[in-house]
Swiss-Prot record:
Topological domain spans for side Extracellular: 1-52, 112-130, 197-226, 307-326
Glycosylation sites: N17, N35, N216, N307
PANTHER family, per database record: G-PROTEIN COUPLED RECEPTOR FAMILY 1 MEMBER, PROSTAGLANDIN E2 RECEPTOR EP3 SUBTYPE
Protein name: Prostaglandin E2 receptor EP3 subtype
Subunit structure: Interacts (via C-terminus) with MKLN1.
Keyword list, A-Z: Cell membrane, G-protein coupled receptor, Glycoprotein, Lipoprotein, Membrane, Palmitate, Receptor, Transducer, Transmembrane, Transmembrane helix
Disulphide bridges, residue numbers: none
InterPro entries the UniProt entry points to: EP3_rcpt_1, GPCR_Rhodpsn, GPCR_Rhodpsn_7TM, Prostanoid_rcpt, Prostglndn_DP_rcpt, Prostglndn_EP3_rcpt
UniProt subcellular location: Cell membrane
Homology family: Belongs to the G-protein coupled receptor 1 family.
Native source species: Bos taurus (Bovine)
GO CC, alphabetical: plasma membrane
Lineage, highest ranks first: Eukaryota, Metazoa, Chordata, Craniata, Vertebrata
Major localization class: membrane
One matching Pfam family: 7tm_1
């Protein structure tokens, strides 16, 4: 009897152009040897779309984070104030974390797409899968915790300026950032020690934390470890989001209260109003980006844990296929956060964009005039350059200093630096 092809049960990639159709095909044939239905032939368009998507995300993330690291590093070398350097360290560490995380994972996905092979064929030992899952866990949680640390720093600077001015030093910032990274790394190594498991995820092009019972070779202890590790990851991620939201809201409240305390409509009062508005908008933007990118994945992981399911069932294309597709979208949203971070925190700030426009106008004006504009162009370039950017960071973080003998907050502004 001649075998036929069932296009109705075609893999996810064939229908939605997300993955190569041959990745799971061989495994389904092994699981159902009596089924005469053959998997659909590989689609070149499907593979090209997947590769283009992965390469676009990797290149975009690399460019944005590399630009942020360059600006921050130059600014850091020019700054003398310790409190100014603390916030620059946080920004630079976040950009470096996002960039390294993408560079370690995206090439693996691209190679797998281009090879048109199953993961097990390229990684028979499973070590690459463990490395991939560990990398996603480390750099994913690190980004969330660094964002939380930055939110805590902003809240302390505005609500406890005296304590912040006397205790917050560059060495403390370095220790906190290094401690965060080491703690997350230790947590991510738990599956290597037997607590939890990194498994191949739908549609077979990446590895991540297993959220439910493993394969046929897992016992009850391993299943318990999977549940514990996946639950801990989701709870830690959601806790980081809650801390970030709470601290950002506290910062906004402190700024609004300080703005209202200005009794007169002086220039200082107008400046405070502008700073408060711009900062509140940016902090709300940060909260929106974090919630949209991370909440779907973390909440869905908890849902799958409570339902005792995992993406292992996606291989058979059951009635839960929509859940598999949504899980893939949730992971891609989390990956998108690594691309958006440098733009939300730094590159799309109004002040920086205005300075770039001034620089462009300065170059254009200098082409048509002589002599008298050289000093002006040079001054604009210097203002645009990193020294002015560092002052802007102080506005962004709302670093404060307590004046000796006075009980009010003193805010560094661009005009007074």
């Amino acid at each position: 009897m001649k075998a036929t092809r069932d296009h109705a049960s075609a893999p996810f990639c064939t229908r939605f152009n997300h993955s190569d159709p041959g990745i799971w095909a061989a495994e389904r044939a092994v699981e159902a040897p009596n089924n005469l239905t053959l998997p659909p032939e590989p689609s070149e368009d499907c593979g090209s779309v997947s590769v283009a998507f992965s390469m676009t995300m990797m290149i975009t993330g690399f460019v944005g984070n590399a630009l942020a690291i360059t600006l921050v590093s130059k600014s850091y070398r020019r700054r003398e104030g310790k409190r100014k350097k603390s916030f620059l360290l946080c920004i630079g560490w976040l950009a470096l974390t996002d960039m390294v995380g993408q560079l370690l994972t995206s090439p693996v996905v691209i190679v797998l797409y281009l090879s048109h092979q199953r993961w097990e064929q390229l990684d028979p030992s499973g070590r690459l899968c463990t490395f991939f899952g560990l990398t996603m866990t480390v750099f994913g949680l690190s980004s969330l915790f660094i964002a939380s640390a930055m939110a805590v720093e902003r809240a302390l600077a505005t609500r406890a300026p005296h304590w912040y001015s006397s205790h917050m030093k560059t060495s403390v910032t370095r220790a906190v950032l290094l401690g965060v990274w080491l703690a997350v790394l230790a947590f991510a190594l738990l599956p290597v020690l037997g607590v939890g498991q990194y498994t191949i995820q739908w549609p077979g092009t990446w590895c991540f934390i297993s959220t439910g019972p493993g394969g046929n070779g897992t016992n009850s202890r391993q299943n318990w470890g999977n549940v514990f590790f996946a639950s801990a990851f989701a709870i830690l991620g959601l806790s980081a989001l809650v801390v970030t939201f709470a601290c950002n809201l506290a910062t906004i409240k402190a700024l609004v209260s300080r703005c209202r305390a200005k009794a007169t409509a002086s220039q200082s009062s107008a400046q405070w109003g502008r700073i408060t508005t711009e900062t509140a908008i940016q902090l709300m933007g940060i909260m929106c980006v974090l919630s949209v990118c991370w909440s779907p994945l973390l909440i869905m992981m908890l849902k799958m844990i409570f339902n005792h399911t995992s993406v292992e069932h996606c291989k058979t294309y059951t009635e839960n296929q929509d859940e598999c597709n949504f899980f893939l979208i949730a992971v891609r949203l989390a990956s998108l956060n690594q691309i958006l971070d440098p733009w939300v925190y730094l590159l799309l700030r109004k002040i920086l964009l205005q300075k770039f426009c001034q620089l462009l106008k300065g170059h254009s004006y200098g082409l048509d005039t002589e002599g008298g504009t050289e000093n002006k162009d040079k001054e604009m370039k210097e203002n645009l350059y990193i020294s002015n950017l560092s002052r802007f960071f102080i506005l962004l973080g709302h670093f404060t200093e307590a004046r000796r003998g006075r009980g009010h907050i003193y805010l560094h502004t661009l005009e007074h630096q």
